[in-house]
Amino acid sequence: MIDRIQWLGHGSFLIQGPPLIYINPWRVASSTFHADVILISHDNYDLCSVADVNKLRGENTIVLGNEAVQEQIDDVELLRPWQARTFDRASIKGIPAYSIKSMRYPKEAGGLGFVISLNFYDIYYAGNTEMTPEMERIQPDIAILPINGDGALDVPGAVDVVKKMHPRWVIPSHWGSVGEGATREDAKAFKDAIGGRATVVISEQTR
């Protein structure tokens, strides 16, 4: 399953199921294949892009997000924390994503992460979040974790999450772009800190 997850840069991912799932598409190329499902975790401009959703959206595409996302993008179906939806062979559950140490992403804003259960694997996309008590309930096979800090997990925080969740694979996100706050060196430092606890996949940027 790990080879069917493609990092598109920043917080954007493509999961090739079926169904075809995009998470937070931003600055993506237009595709001849419409998404089956598009997941939007927060209402930030770099995660909630109307233009990018429209590039990927077809007549039957389902877009899921919180109430703030609904205010920015037309025809978004509401997904609440711990609510699960099923599409084809995938189950998608909303997970609270928020800051504790700072007010960058307050819990009241309703930010989401996602647990995507597909082909007998549980994939956890953390979103913009620090370590939260809700993570105690998640034991994924694959974890996608930010490492850029700024109200979300930084490298030490992401390492602590891996120690708590024990995933088999981890993909660091939110690094390498201009103004990102985390670099390839940070991604490598994260991999070194994880050691043998999990397999860390440092993807090549597609843009």
Language-model features and meaning:
Residues 1-33, 78-138, 153, 204-207:
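Core dinuclear metal-dependent hydrolase active-site scaffold
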Residues 5-6, 74-87, 108, 136, ...:
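Binuclear metal-ion centers of metallo-dependent hydrolases, dominated by the metallo-beta-lactamase
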Residues 12, 50-57, 113, 135-136, ...:
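Short amphipathic alpha-helical segments and helix-helix/interface helices
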Residues 23, 39-40, 93-97, 145, ...:
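Redox-cofactor binding/interface segments in oxidoreductases and associated redox assembly factors
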Residues 26-71, 139-144, 166:
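Active-site metal-binding motif and surrounding structural segment of the metallo-beta-lactamase
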Residues 27-28, 44-45, 68-70, 81-85, ...:
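Short, acidic/turn-prone active-site loops that include or flank metal/cofactor-
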Residues 35-41, 61, 73-92, 141, ...:
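Active-site regions of enzymes building and remodeling cell-envelope glycoconjugates
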Residues 115-182:
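Metallo-beta-lactamase
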